[in-house]
Regions:
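TOPRIM fold recognition
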Residues: 115-116, 132-206
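Glycine-/acidic-rich phosphate or pyrophosphate-binding loops and their flanking alpha/beta elements
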Residues: 95-116
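Short active-site loop/helix that positions an aromatic residue
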Residues: 1, 127-136
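Short acidic-glycine loop/turn motifs at beta-strand connectors
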Residues: 78-83, 90
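Helix N-cap/beta->alpha junction signal
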Residues: 122-123, 172
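Active-site-proximal, Lys/Arg-enriched surface segment
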Residues: 55-76, 100-107
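Serine endopeptidase catalytic core focused on the charge-relay Asp
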Residues: 44-56, 80
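Non-catalytic accessory segments of DNA primases and related replication-initiation nucleases
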Residues: 1-49
Length: 206
């Protein structure tokens, strides 16, 4: 990694984001889930339980890229432009959903303010997990770790390929295989387990 994680998050917050398409409309009805009052204890417990270091969770919260909603106590990952959010349940019942202003929006985190490669994952927790795995392996480089909220979001993949070299890093399952076949011209990175968070857990809890 070319800079500390703190510096990387600061760089992310100063980054102006990926260029917008000139033809996109504005004013689309969109709202983020209501934010709970800190300290977001359910989100912190959930993500640290998934192998994400407390330092990483707290930095994402501090930089307004992650919060806990109310009344459901979900984890909400918010894109820097606030036009996309990914909602992850923190309770015993699994829940994963997205809200976005336009269909091609996405969540991302950078390891450098001038990314040279975008690693495209299915979920924000997997994007963060892959970033942490690369950090352990010493291969973060100048990268953006992106969540598209599911492999059906082909418009986002197409948009990203017009901005940066893309590596498909979607799940190791049938839907991921379909996505790789659909984008056969793109390089791929496939998790050993079902997804990158499972791979991270295998590293931190051998």
């Amino acid at each position: 990694m070319n800079c500390s994680f703190t510096a990387a998050v600061n760089a992310l917050c100063k980054f102006n984001g990926f260029p917008r398409d000139k033809t996109e409309a504005t004013g689309t009805l969109f709202c983020l889930p209501e934010k709970a009052d800190p300290p977001f204890s359910h989100v912190i417990a959930y993500l640290t339980g998934r192998g994400i270091p407390l330092e990483t969770v707290m930095l994402l919260i501090h930089e307004d890229l992650l919060y806990q909603d109310t009344p459901h106590k979900n984890a909400v990952f918010v894109s820097p432009d606030k036009e996309y959010c990914e909602i992850r349940g923190t309770g015993s019942k699994s829940f994963h959903g997205c809200r976005k202003k336009k269909s091609d929006r996405f969540w991302y985190i950078l390891t450098d303010p001038k990314p040279e490669t975008a690693y495209v994952c299915e979920a924000a927790i997997d994007a963060v997990s892959l970033m942490l795995i690369h950090k352990v392996q010493g291969m973060n480089g100048h990268a953006a770790y992106v969540s598209i909220g599911g492999v059906a979001n082909q418009r986002t993949i197409d948009r990203l390929t017009n901005k940066l070299p893309v590596v498909l890093a979607v799940d190791n399952d049938s839907a991921g295989n379909d996505c790789r076949r659909r984008n056969a011209d793109l390089p791929t990175l496939i998790p050993h387990n079902k997804d990158w968070n499972d791979d991270l857990l295998e590293i931190v809890r051998p």
